[in-house]
Amino acid sequence: MQKARIKLSSTQHTELDGVCNQIKAIAEKTGVDMAGPIPLPTKALKVTTRKSTDGEGSSSFDRWTMRVHKRVIDIEADERTMKHIMKVRIPDTVQIEIELRN
């Protein structure tokens, strides 16, 4: 039987966990084997910009940080389960990637 690896990433960890819980509920309902959700390390993207645009005055900076949270779920990819997963409502802030493996 084929396996599906579902990779999820988002800047909002609460919405990401909500989608993971929906996929977990589908796996329990259909009775397929599932591993995960496995949390991967959070990537912190940092940008530092200078507040003063003209270059005069004291050097003061703004620091911006965006955290990207990731999860991986391995699940048996039978047709019924995959149809249910495709119907899950996914928020705009969550990116999903499904890869089928033998």
Curated annotation (Swiss-Prot):
GO biological process, one term: translation
Superkingdom per UniProt: Archaea
Ligase is among the record's keywords: no
Keyword Glycosyltransferase found: no
GO cellular component terms, semicolon-separated: small ribosomal subunit
PROSITE patterns per UniProt: RIBOSOMAL_S10
The entry's keywords: Ribonucleoprotein, Ribosomal protein
InterPro entries (UniProt xref): Ribosomal_uS10, Ribosomal_uS10_CS, Ribosomal_uS10_dom, Ribosomal_uS10_dom_sf, Ribosomal_uS10_euk/arc
Example GO molecular function: structural constituent of ribosome
Oligomeric form and interacting partners: Part of the 30S ribosomal subunit.
Family listed: Belongs to the universal ribosomal protein uS10 family.
Cited function: Involved in the binding of tRNA to the ribosomes.
Protein name per UniProt: Small ribosomal subunit protein uS10
Organism: Methanococcus maripaludis (strain C5 / ATCC BAA-1333)
Lineage, opening ranks: Archaea, Methanobacteriati, Methanobacteriota, Methanomada group, Methanococci
